[in-house]
């Protein structure tokens, strides 16, 4: 369970900061492009990746949240988890271990690999997006 206050702060402060910073960076990028200032454009790339990733990751995170939700999945999701990990409990154990193992700030993910049609648990540092980092389509994200 995550308290409403924590979620409000996360949504209105943290996520909003990523959006605001990304907008500011993209405006600076536009100005640098118009001035043909390649050095300024390159200098903005880390901030664009960080804030853009923060926005992408948190947007996915909110779609995973619901009041009074929880429990084991059903249907095709449950079948895919059981096929890949053996059981829902085995998935939870692997997901938890991977997420707790993130050093500093980052994300724990359940993702889908379209190349081999399998689910996978992965982690990303800071706000690196899962699809760009591991080539996985994000299904479930945990901000750690």
UniProtKB/Swiss-Prot annotation:
Pfam families: Sod_Fe_C (PF02777), Sod_Fe_N (PF00081). Mn(2+) binds at residues 10, 58, 143. Its cofactor is Mn(2+). Gene3D superfamilies: Fe,Mn superoxide dismutase (SOD) domain (1.10.287.990), Iron/manganese superoxide dismutase, C-terminal domain (3.55.40.20). InterPro entries: Fe/Mn_Superoxide_Dismutase, Mn/Fe_SOD, Mn/Fe_SOD_C, Mn/Fe_SOD_N, Mn/Fe_SOD_N_sf, SOD_C_sf. One of its GO terms (cellular component) is mitochondrial matrix. It is found in: Mitochondrion matrix. Its EC number is 1.15.1.1. It comes from the Eukaryota. It is an enzyme of class 1 (oxidoreductase). GO terms for molecular function: manganese ion binding; superoxide dismutase activity. Keywords: Manganese, Metal-binding, Mitochondrion, Oxidoreductase. It catalyses: 2 superoxide + 2 H(+) = H2O2 + O2. Binds 1 Mn(2+) ion per subunit. The keyword Metal-binding applies. SUPFAM superfamilies: Fe,Mn superoxide dismutase (SOD), C-terminal domain, Fe,Mn superoxide dismutase (SOD), N-terminal domain. The keyword RNA-binding does not apply. Belongs to the iron/manganese superoxide dismutase family. Destroys superoxide anion radicals which are normally produced within the cells and which are toxic to biological systems. PANTHER family: SUPEROXIDE DISMUTASE 2, SUPEROXIDE DISMUTASE [MN], MITOCHONDRIAL. Homotetramer. This is Superoxide dismutase [Mn], mitochondrial. It comes from Palinurus vulgaris (European spiny lobster). The lineage of its organism: Eukaryota, Metazoa, Ecdysozoa, Arthropoda, Crustacea.
